[in-house]
C-alpha cells in the first residue's frame, strides 16, 4: 500500500482516495485502477500523462536529458560497450561477466541463418515494395517456421524466441535491401561482429567481397545501441498491447515494426533527409530557417527537437561525434551533407533555436551517417527496427514475467444516443 494518497472529488460528493505510487526515479503516479468502480474513467488521448505499466528497463528524464538502460547512462554504453553487451543488459538487467557475454554472443552468432524457405517468401513481394512492408510480412511469418517456441507462458520458449529474433533480424533486414535492388542474398558470417556482419550482408556481392571498415562498423554499432530502447514509445506500447492478448512473439514484433513505420515515429531520420533534399543547397538555408521561425508557415525543420527531451537529446551528443568521425573517414563531399552541417551550426548558435531548445536530435545525425555509408533512406527505418528489436523483446518478456491483463482502453463516447432503426432500403 502506498504511503501517499490523492483525493478526487466527484460532483462535490465524498472524495475518492487513490494511492500515489513512487518509482525509483521520475514522477509519482496516481493509481486510478479503482475509478472504474466509481463509474468514471480518465481521459488522456495519446497517453501523455498515463503510466501504462511498471517497468525496470529504461528511464528517461526529458527535462534533464537523461536516458538510462537498467541504470546505465546511454552515453557510457555507447562509448564503452557494444550492441550485444547492451542487448544482454536490457534482457537480463545486469552487466554480463566475460563468460556470460561470450556465451550470449556465441548463441546469437550461431542463429543468424534463417530457414531457406523464408528466403523464397521475399519473391512474393514486388521488388519496389517499401522494405518496411517486407519486414512486417517476413517477421510475422517466422511464427510459421519456428512454432516450437510459441508458448508465451513457457520461459524457455520466450528465451528461444528472443534469441531467434535478435539473431535473424540483421539477416532479414539485409535481405530486404538486396531483394529491392535485384542482387543475390548474402548469408551471414560467424567471424564478423553483429554490426560488421550486417554491413557485409548489405554491401558484399559475389563478384566483389566487402571489406568492413572499422570506423563504419563502430558507427553502425553505435547507431544500434542508441536506438535499442526508449521506454514506452508508440511501437513498444504496440508490442505490449499485442503481447497482452497472448499473441506469439513474432506477431508482436511484427506489430511493433508496423507501428515504427509511421513517419511520426521511426520515419523521422528518413524525413530529415528528405528535408535536406528539399533545401538542396547551403545558399537556400536562410530562407528555410526563416520559414521554420514563421509559425504561420507549414514548413518544419525535421530532426530538431524531441517530444520527450526538452533538453539536448543525450543520444545526439554521441551520434554527433560519430557523424563527424564517419565523414572524416570517408572524406565525403556531398551537397546534402554540407547542408546538414550548416544547419547544425545554425541550430547550435542561433538564439531562436537555443531558446526553444530545438537542438539536432539523434534522427538528424543518424540519417547523415547512414547516407554517407551508402545506405538508401528507404532502409533507415528498417535499421531502426533491427536496433529496437531487443528493446521490444525486453519489454515483451518483462510483461510476461510480471503477469499482465489484456489491454482494454476505454473511451469518451460522443456519438448518437440510442435510436430506433427502420431501413429505407428496398430488399
UniProtKB/Swiss-Prot annotation:
Changing residue 208 to A: Weakened NADH binding and inhibition. GO terms for cellular component: cytosol. Gene3D superfamilies: 2.20.28.60, Citrate Synthase, domain 1, Cytochrome P450-Terp, domain 2. It catalyses: oxaloacetate + acetyl-CoA + H2O = citrate + CoA + H(+). The active site is at 306, 363. It is an enzyme of class 2 (transferase). The keyword DNA damage does not apply. The keyword Cell inner membrane does not apply. One of its GO terms (biological process) is tricarboxylic acid cycle. The modification N6-acetyllysine is found at residue 283. InterPro entries: Citrate_synth-like_lrg_a-sub, Citrate_synth-like_sm_a-sub, Citrate_synthase, Citrate_synthase_AS, Citrate_synthase_bac-typ, Citrate_synthase_sf, Citrate_synthase_typ-I. Keywords: Acetylation, Allosteric enzyme, Transferase, Tricarboxylic acid cycle. Pfam families: Citrate_synt. GO terms for molecular function: citrate (Si)-synthase activity; identical protein binding; NADH binding. PANTHER family: CITRATE SYNTHASE (PTHR42871:SF1). Citrate synthase is found in nearly all cells capable of oxidative metabolism. This is Citrate synthase. It comes from Escherichia coli (strain K12).
